[in-house]
């Protein structure tokens, strides 16, 4: 689904939802926008000029992701160091089960090797070599480059070129010279195609991931940008005067003309994490477990002491890339997850594939004949057949019943409703185990608030919270558009990374240590200048730009480094060095405890970065006066039969839009809105606070 959330200057918001249209994402975007405008009562004729009222528009889409999934990007040629022509097909063992469930991870036959974006016949090796210190060992053979360029650009008619040489992150002269030769060949051939260099796209170690990053940029960035331009054009037709913005994987907003657009390839779930971080700053909770239930996947991340960790080598569509991304883990467990019976064991098998939003659950009668989790929600009475997406989508409960009986219940020899509840319990167990086993290892769950969002988040939140002793459990009425809302909570941000290797021994004198870290300072200064100039060119004023140097540090001999925002701008004295390494040690002991800290350890700086930010106006959470505990009459919609714990019960039904801050509700209940549904089991109690946030506690623990 495509969600649009409109936030006004008072912090009020409204959510619109529409089916995603992958062939032209502007269609789904505009339909969702118009639905939101209808909801707040903007007349049709005024909607055609509503763009004049928009200060900014931010789009977090899956254009680049879809391009890679569907293998519909540019025909890309690869020029690389001779002997490394197969680098596009190479990889690491663990990339064969990225995002898979544990059952797939533990069985080799389920593992899948991706199809390379660059086929072997479009890869050319050229003679050159730079060593690990940046020294030229073999000068580049320019005639090799010219021949490779001619074969790829002229003979093969490639639509883009990726250039990836060994050690180019230390010394980029060979890649830049190769690009000059390619442009000359391109000019002679009368063509104009993008040429991407790994030293510009991802100047960091991990050569296979660096190559993948450059190839994805060359393969998918321009096709994805065309989708973004379509959305911008549609907005301008209704009076929007600014440029469309998009979200980058590390939680920043940027112009859609941003050159390294591949950094936005994995931004689909970032909005939710950033929205959770902002929400936490308002309510005063900086330890949050974020859980997003969509149609296809269950995504989870952890905010620890207000910090969202960044993964510099995330998995992306069966490969690893060098692109900073907020840490988030996913499994194929959403409301559209397919339910099948394994013919060998006669057991229930959930996913990992999904109907998603198209063709959707069987009850939508759009061609899908495999039952999904949402069919279970409908059969059990949790979802209202007359209120699916506010009643805009036709639902046929009988179709859902018949297909579920035929394909799930009868093979199991179970009653339809018993089988449906069993499937729901299995899904909730999968979600709970995913959070506790992969996210909260080493953390005390009692210190964390569990936040549920996404269209299916409130629907499954309390069942997968289970008996785990979270500090609190909460959701929001705009959960269905929470990730979109999170986009409005982000600053405008760019960041640049560069690999380095600097070792600081505690026995060094101040002069020796300052001299050793001089390369760090030099790279910081260079990255600062690049980012500053980028933002100035985009129209920002110098006083708006905040630049933060970052160092990635570990103890010598250890495998994992930590991101340390530097409290100082340079490293010219012992005080500067102490400030940086003290910040590292504080972070290290916070994550791994004081007992893990080696005494007198040698520091190893493995990578440096600079983050450039421009603060934006954030949505404001309005404080309301608290009403009576009892919900108003217009919020109470009677009861509905609901199957729970092997029997039918009468559940209280409430209209979410009419509930007020201060209201309290006991389970068994269903609180439904047009874009989401909150299911409240019998053992839970709901309280709405002054910010209209829904807090859930087990009865007896209020």
Which functions belong to the PLM regions below?
Residues 143, 147-151, 155, 233, ...:
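C-terminal, non-catalytic interaction/recognition modules in large multi-subunit enzymes and RNPs
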Residues 1-2, 59-64, 166-175, 270, ...:
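Gly/Ser/Thr-rich loops at beta-strand to alpha-helix junctions
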Residues 162-214, 218, 387-388, 566-568, ...:
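Terminal amphipathic helices with adjacent charged low-complexity linkers/tails
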Residues 1-5, 14-38, 65, 77, ...:
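Conserved phosphate-binding loops in N-terminal lobes of ATP-dependent enzymes
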């Amino acid at each position: 689904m495509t969600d649009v959330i409109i936030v006004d200057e008072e912090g009020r918001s409204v959510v619109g939802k529409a089916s995603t249209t992958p062939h032209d994402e502007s269609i789904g975007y505009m339909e969702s926008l118009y639905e939101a405008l209808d909801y707040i009562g903007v007349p049709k004729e005024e909607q055609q000029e509503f763009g004049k009222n928009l200060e900014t528009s931010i789009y977090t889409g899956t254009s680049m992701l879809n391009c890679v999934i569907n293998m519909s990007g540019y025909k890309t040629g690869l020029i690389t160091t001779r002997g490394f022509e197969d680098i596009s097909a190479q990889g690491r063992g663990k990339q064969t089960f990225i995002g898979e469930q544990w059952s797939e991870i533990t069985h080799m036959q389920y593992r899948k090797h991706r199809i390379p974006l660059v086929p072997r016949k479009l890869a050319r090796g050229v003679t050159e070599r730079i060593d690990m210190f940046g020294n030229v060992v073999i000068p580049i053979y320019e005639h090799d480059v010219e021949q490779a360029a001619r074969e790829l650009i002229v003979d093969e008619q490639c639509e883009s070129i990726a250039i990836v040489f060994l050690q180019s992150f230390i010394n980029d002269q060979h890649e830049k010279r190769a690009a000059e030769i390619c442009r000359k060949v391109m000019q002679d051939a009368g063509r104009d195609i993008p040429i991407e260099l790994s030293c510009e796209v991802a100047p960091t170690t991990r050569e296979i991931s660096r190559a993948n990053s450059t190839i994805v940029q060359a393969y998918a960035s321009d096709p994805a940008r065309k989708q973004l331009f379509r959305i911008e054009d549609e907005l301008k037709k209704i009076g929007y005067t600014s440029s469309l913005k998009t979200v980058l994987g590390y939680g920043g907003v940027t112009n859609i003309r941003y050159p390294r657009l591949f950094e936005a390839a994995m931004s689909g779930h970032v909005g939710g994490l950033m929205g959770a971080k902002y929400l936490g700053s308002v309510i005063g909770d900086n330890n949050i477990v974020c859980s997003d239930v969509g149609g296809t996947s269950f995504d989870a991340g952890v905010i620890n002491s207000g910090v969202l960790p960044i993964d510099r080598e995330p998995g992306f569509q069966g490969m690893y890339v060098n692109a900073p991304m907020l840490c988030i883990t996913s499994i194929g467990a959403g409301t559209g997850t397919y339910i099948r019976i394994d013919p060998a064991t006669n057991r229930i098998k959930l996913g990992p594939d999904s109907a998603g939003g198209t063709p959707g659950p069987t009850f939508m009668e759009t061609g899908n004949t495999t039952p999904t989790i949402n069919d279970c929600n409908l059969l059990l009475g949790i979802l209202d057949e007359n209120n699916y997406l506010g009643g805009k989508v036709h639902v046929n409960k009988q179709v859902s019943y018949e297909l579920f009986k035929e394909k799930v219940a009868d093979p199991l020899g179970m009653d339809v409703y018993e089988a449906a509840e069993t499937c729901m319990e299995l899904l909730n167990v999968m979600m709970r185990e995913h959070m506790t086993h992969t996210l909260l290892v080493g953390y005390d769950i009692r210190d964390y608030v569990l936040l549920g969002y996404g269209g299916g988040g409130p629907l499954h939140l309390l069942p997968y919270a289970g008996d785990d002793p979270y500090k609190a459990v909460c959701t929001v009425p705009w959960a269905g558009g929470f990730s979109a809302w999170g986009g409005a909570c982000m600053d405008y941000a760019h960041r640049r990374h560069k690999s380095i290797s600097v070792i600081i021994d505690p026995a060094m004198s101040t002069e020796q240590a300052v001299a050793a870290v001089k390369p760090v300072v030099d790279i910081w200064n260079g990255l600062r200048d690049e980012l500053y100039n980028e933002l100035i060119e985009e129209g920002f004023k110098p006083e708006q730009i905040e630049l933060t140097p970052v160092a990635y540090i570990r103890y010598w001999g250890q495998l994992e480094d930590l991101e340390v925002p530097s409290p100082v701008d340079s490293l010219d004295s012992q005080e500067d060095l102490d400030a940086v390494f003290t910040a590292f040690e504080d972070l290290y002991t916070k994550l791994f405890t004081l007992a893990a800290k080696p005494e007198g350890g040698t520091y190893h700086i493995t990578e440096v970065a600079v983050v450039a930010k421009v603060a934006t106006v954030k949505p404001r959470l309005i404080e309301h006066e608290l009403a009576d505990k009892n919900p108003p009459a217009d919020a109470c919609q009677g009861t509905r039969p609901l199957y729970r714990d092997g029997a039918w019960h009468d559940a209280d039904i409430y209209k979410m839009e009419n509930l007020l801050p201060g209201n309290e509700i006991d389970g068994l209940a269903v609180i439904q809105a047009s874009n989401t549904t909150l299911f409240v089991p019998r053992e839970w109690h709901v309280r709405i606070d002054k910010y209209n946030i829904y807090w859930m506690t087990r009865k007896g623990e209020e």
